[in-house]
Regions:
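Outer-membrane beta-barrel transmembrane domain signature
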Residues: 58-65, 70-173, 182-185
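Short glycine/proline- and aromatic-enriched beta-strand/turn motifs that initiate or cap beta-hairpins
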Residues: 6-58, 182
Length: 185
């Protein structure tokens, strides 16, 4: 009864799940600006370059009656298609886990910000942006949807490498729209 009174059962079921493994595959878009990709996804154009990512995350803070968590995530990704290289990303950010419909469909939204290191200068980023670097800023936005009180959810993510307005490079970066699975444990 105490768990029920503290909020959604979907959120409460995740209270002790401080770790997650995510696996996703995405396709790189030729749309340069991430906000244009989000505003008009139906008209997005893509190149023949893809990425497959495995990630582990850890909750490092809980706030607002467990509705908001702070997470750190490490990723290993492989880029294939028109380019072939590895990518390592480390990001931290918030995840909101409580919505009015969470008892029907467990939902979360998240944002992560950190660094991305590619094993070589990504060819597709050079083609799209004119230049790039191995080390860029990395950020992501995602939405998860799954059954209430379940350890798994479908993951829809925008995976973004960026020069951060000249902070790490004059040009470079990419946007990938990805779909995968997130498992909490």
């Amino acid at each position: 009864m105490l768990l029920w009174s503290s909020g959604s059962t979907a959120a409460c079921a995740q209270e002790t799940r401080d770790k997650a493994a995510s696996f996703y595959v995405g396709r790189i878009s030729s749309v340069n600006a991430w906000h244009d990709l989000i505003k008009d996804p139906a008209n997005a154009e893509f190149v023949d370059a893809y990425l497959a990512v495995a990630a582990l995350s850890q909750v490092v803070g809980r706030y607002s009656d467990d509705r908001l968590t702070l997470e750190v995530e490490g990723q290993v990704g492989y880029n294939f298609g028109d380019q072939s290289h590895w990518e390592i990303n480390l990001a931290a950010g918030p995840r909101w886990r409580q919505f009015p419909w969470s008892d029907v469909v467990a939902t979360s939204v998240a944002f992560g910000l950190g660094l991305s290191m590619a094993s070589e200068v990504p060819e597709v980023e050079v083609e799209l942006e004119g230049a790039s670097e191995q080390l860029l800023v990395y950020w992501n936005m995602d939405v998860t949807l799954g059954p209430p009180r379940s350890s798994w959810a479908v993951l829809l993510r925008l995976h973004h490498r960026s020069s951060a307005f000249g902070l790490l490079a004059d040009d470079g970066g990419m946007n990938a729209v990805a779909l995968g699975l997130r498992i909490t444990f």
